[in-house]
Amino acid sequence: MTFLEEILAQKAVEVADMPLEKVAEKRKTYSFYEFLKANTNTMQLIAEVKRASPSKGEINMGVNPVLQAKSYQAAGAGMISVLTDPVFFKGSIEDLREVAKNVEIPVLCKDFIISEKQLIRARNAGATVVLLIISALTEEMLITLFEQALALDLEVLVEVHDQKELAVAQKIGAKLIGVNNRNLHTFEVDIAVSERLASDFSSDACFISESGFRTAEDVARVSQKYNAVLVGEALMREATPEAAAKSLKVTR
């Protein structure tokens, strides 16, 4: 089994046991898409709270998610991403709930979403943006979840890894498209993935490059075609995450 296949098998078990929550009031913050459209002079940052990963194992198990998120916000991050997968990334929906209560900016629920139950749970916990990963879904599931998320007044970050997936994301009208430099089957990372796919951008979406960023020089590689980068591990390993996050702000 690949990493992705293993994660999805476990996710199906997790979701089967997950209750269907009633939709509660949505947390108030700004639209991340509108924020990116209005702030184009600088590469914006999605800063991630991530305790562990399947490929790297434990990254920062002792992190205080709220303090980490507040450091990111103080550094000027446009959004906080919170891993909520409990098995492979050692996250939880409670991490997201606590972060959302304590920051003003949008919060992304970073998980392998395969059910509307997860969308409602994310919204109720304070997420205003959710991740849909094309390689984890059939096209029919993708469209269904995309429409369900929009009906819940959630923004959707649609994640792609190749030209075919990018074409699908653009076809369904995704406003936020993330190019993951990490192959979810092997977990190998290469920023060149984002460089290659940029030539195929053809919509009014905002584009985010995800994974593999450690320095401002890394970010500069994608600064002409992308609106933002998503950074997790590099910030989670830093003793001073606010300074580390500030160091990744690059002029476009």
Swiss-Prot record:
Answer whether the UniProt record assigns the keyword Lyase to this protein. yes
Q: Which reaction does it catalyse?
A: 1-(2-carboxyphenylamino)-1-deoxy-D-ribulose 5-phosphate + H(+) = (1S,2R)-1-C-(indol-3-yl)glycerol 3-phosphate + CO2 + H2O
Name of this protein: Indole-3-glycerol phosphate synthase
**Keyword Transmembrane helix: yes or no?**
no
According to the UniProt entry, its GO molecular function terms are: indole-3-glycerol-phosphate synthase activity; phosphoribosylanthranilate isomerase activity
- Spell out the family assignment given in the record's similarity comment: Belongs to the TrpC family.
Q: What SUPFAM superfamilies does the record point to?
A: Ribulose-phoshate binding barrel
- What InterPro entries does this protein's entry cite? Aldolase_TIM, Indole-3-glycerol_P_synth, Indole-3-glycerol_P_synth_dom, Indole-3-GlycerolPSynthase_CS, RibuloseP-bd_barrel
**Entry keyword set:** Amino-acid biosynthesis, Aromatic amino acid biosynthesis, Decarboxylase, Lyase, Tryptophan biosynthesis
**Top-level taxonomic group:** Bacteria
Gene name? trpC
